[in-house]
Amino acid sequence: MSKAHPPEVKKYMDKRMMLKLNGGRAVTGILRGFDPFMNVVLDDTVEECKDNTKNNIGMVVIRGNSIVMVEALDRV
């Protein structure tokens, strides 16, 4: 099994991020933590549904293998 390398996302800590997830889902929130497998903790998270509604879901942990794309919404 290959060893995971830590993702270089330290500079994005405490910044607002948008994550596209598998299954066409998308969330935005403030990055509070991550690990070498790109599992992330987001705070003040908002889920953007396909019918253009938004659900506030608070603090969440998202598994790295479900993340398709990451975009910084704040200046780094």
Swiss-Prot record:
GO terms for cellular component: catalytic step 2 spliceosome; cytosol; nucleus; P granule; precatalytic spliceosome; small nuclear ribonucleoprotein complex; SMN-Sm protein complex; spliceosomal complex. It comes from the Eukaryota. Residues 4-76 form the Sm domain. Belongs to the snRNP Sm proteins family. Plays a role in pre-mRNA splicing as a core component of the spliceosomal U1, U2, U4 and U5 small nuclear ribonucleoproteins (snRNPs), the building blocks of the spliceosome. Component of both the pre-catalytic spliceosome B complex and activated spliceosome C complexes. Is also a component of the minor U12 spliceosome. This is Probable small nuclear ribonucleoprotein G. PROSITE patterns: SM. It comes from Drosophila melanogaster (Fruit fly).
